[in-house]
Amino acid sequence: KQIFIALCCFILLFVISLAGCGKGNTKNLVIDYGTSSIYTKDDMDEAIDVIKKQFSSFEGCELHSLSYTSDDACNNEDNIAWMNELEEANDNKESFTQCISFDSSFRSPKNGGGAWNANEEYTWSWWMARSEGGTWKLMTWGY
């Protein structure tokens, strides 16, 4: 019985030690906030946190940079309408009044796997939306 308990403890410690392995790495992230007359640094940081949370599921990838696109690219009627169309397509009811976009570069895992080519640099865009005073919701990301 003692051997069984010791073995269970060893397995538990091993699993706990691996819990952080393989997740998307954002430690060396460089952020370019650009210039905005619409969003504060805090607004952008809240959006960046949403991106980082999603990126953490990109096993073995390393996020290198995030760059705010621009006020013109983000907060225009066409893109806000697009965000609302995406929301409706997902059967959700929130009505967005603001959107924000960041371009990114990141490296895929050295050995590739899944949808990733091995050790390749990717450049993706990340689009989020919110209603006035609300929290950012990640709507779409990719090429």
What does each model-found stretch correspond to?
Residues 2-23:
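Sec-dependent N-terminal signal peptides of Gram-positive bacterial secreted proteins and lipoproteins
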Residues 7-12, 93, 97, 119, ...:
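Residue-level signal for the start and early helices of compact helical domains
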Residues 16, 112-114, 138:
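Short acidic, gly/pro-rich beta-turn/loop elements at beta-sheet edges
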Residues 20-120:
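Flexible low-complexity loop/turn motifs enriched in small/helix-breaking residues
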